[in-house]
Amino acid sequence: MAEFVFQMIKARKSYGDRVILDDVTLSFLPGAKIGVVGPNGMGKSTLLKIMAGLETVSNGEATLTPGFTVGILQQEPPLDDTKTVGENIKMAFGPIAEKVARFNEIGEEMANPDADFDALMEEMGKLQTEIDAADGWDLDSQLEQAMDALQCPDPDTPVNVCSGGERRRVALCKLLLEAPDLLLLDEPTNHLDAESILWLEQFLHQYKGAVIAVTHDRYFMDNVAEWICEVDRGHLYPYKGNYSTYLETKAKRLEIQGAKDAKLAKRLKNELDWVRSSPKARQAKNKARLERYDQMENEARNNKKLDFSEIQIPAGPRLGSTVLEANHIHKAFGDRVLIDDLSFTLPRNGIVGVIGPNGVGKSTLFKTIVGLEPLTSGELKIGDTVKISYVDQNREGLDPNKNLWEAVSGGLDFIEVAGVEVPTRAYVASFGFKGADQQKLTGVLSGGERNRQNLALTLKQGGNLLLLDEPTNDLDVETLESLENALLEFPGCAVVISHDRWFLDRVATHILAWEGDDDNPAKWYWFEGNFQAYQENKVARLGEDAARPHRLHKKLVRG
């Protein structure tokens, strides 16, 4: 009978009077694939740190079975800043690389006529067996493939000059090549584009060890997880199946719990209705939004009462017939062309998902729309009635010494958002900042907290055309669902850069996709429909191979 990799028995974790995990019992076997969900601050990352041995439980037991190895991808992973990207990743091979080096040394020693051939042959045979078992003969090839698939920086790049996203990709690459028996991933899809995420899903499907992933990426959980573990108010609730199955089972649990979770049940019902609907029905619903602008705008005008227990987007000024038109636009920096001969028309009530790898010009497109970057040629026409809401992702104007509430509210108890007076404490709380979190200094916020603050700053501008740059990064599933529902009810337009496929399927009426290649690296494609419909269209236009990740030339088989 197989041994459990890890066990927790009646485990409790607290910090002073604050209980994070309470009376938790769990165990799992090698090969388990588990997705961990729950609101931010409920202890998901703490659970992973306990499994990794970085934290200890206050009471009870938490034990990694002797003989098994464990590795963790943290939200801010530690790397050796004195080494290059390649040197950091090569540390993953450790003992295997040493065995390969020793194997080669033996070959040289056997050229000596005085060598002890029997002893050397015995050592060589043992080393060969161990290297074969670890698939250790092509380490350089594995390294190159994994770095390419995850878009790691050049191997000679010093780690100390890498951005936060680059460091995470380097750390993830190193961890996957280490191939621990228990692989712990905290938001593994952050800072990955759609092609890298697809590669990671395929890699984890073949992974022999146990995988525990904290992630907000619901398609990732649908495609990888065989169990969902929900962390809620100190307790763990296991659900057999993937994320869609979890939604079904949790809905039944909430029915039993009754009205105390009425708002959560309503939000869950909205998502569950979407999951149960056919792809054609989803597409029809998204398309129908384009014809309902007048109705949605009138309803928003007549309903001035807002409930900021969830994210709300008040209606901006009424849109005219023209919102945004791109006519043969071209954008280049010197010889580097990012956008070439792109034309599209954004209709009223349209929500556009902008997709493509990092560095192909998505954020540059936003800067051309708001006038921060000039076009090289072509024309961008913005309607006279359009008011744009946009905050630059660099956020250079924010005072790091102001607390979060002050930065968003300007120190006012009430602010006006699109003609509606809003209590600022409640407004900030709707983005997941409760109580003492509102007093955190802007300069020390985590990446996820800065992202939510950026979203609050953008939406308070009261525009009717929202430009949102990666709003889904580091949001928990509940906040994501709240944002999705707010966008679906918003009478206006949005252009959203995101790699979250579930999010784009639910809200997008159009997709603007980078489809560049060696011949035309600045090619973009405008499509009416959501993400899934776009993917089907892409296969129909370009063939089945278009849906596969192209960075992976040969599968990794180690681990």
Ranges and model annotations:
Residues 249-282, 286-292, 296-303:
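Intracellular alpha-helical coupling/juxtamembrane segments of multi-pass membrane proteins
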Residues 1-262, 308, 312-559:
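ABC ATP-binding cassette signature C-motif
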